[in-house]
From Swiss-Prot:
Superkingdom to which the source organism belongs: Bacteria
Residue ranges of the TM segments: none
Reaction(s) catalysed (UniProt annotation): Exonucleolytic cleavage in either 5'- to 3'- or 3'- to 5'-direction to yield nucleoside 5'-phosphates
Function: Bidirectionally degrades single-stranded DNA into large acid-insoluble oligonucleotides, which are then degraded further into small acid-soluble oligonucleotides.
Gene3D superfamilies: Exonuclease VII, small subunit
Keywords: Cytoplasm, Exonuclease, Hydrolase, Nuclease
GO BP terms in the entry: DNA catabolic process
Subunit structure: Heterooligomer composed of large and small subunits.
Protein name according to UniProt: Exodeoxyribonuclease 7 small subunit
Length: 80
């Protein structure tokens, strides 16, 4: 999958995830519909997380190549 396709796919998944959250928060779905929406949301969330993880790894590799030094894994909790 090309970079543009991956970014487009990520953006589409994120948009769909946002729509699902809005639907779930509206409390207008039946239990069955809510469970299906939740299940789909979990899947989309996992796909988005996978793309973000891959992007983070690419950035680390590029920075290592540029600086020629070993980088520590980014920990968002330490940097907040």
């Amino acid at each position: 999958m090309s970079r543009k396709t991956t970014v487009r796919h990520f953006e589409e998944n994120l948009s769909e995830l946002d729509t699902l959250v809005t639907q779930l928060e509206s409390n207008q779905l039946s239990l069955e519909e809510a469970l299906k929406a939740f299940e789909k949301g979990v899947k989309l969330s996992q796909e988005c997380q996978s793309v973000l993880t891959q992007a983070e790894q690419k950035v680390q590799i590029l920075l290592e190549k540029q600086d020629g030094e070993h980088l520590e894994t980014f920990d968002p909790e330490l940097n907040s």
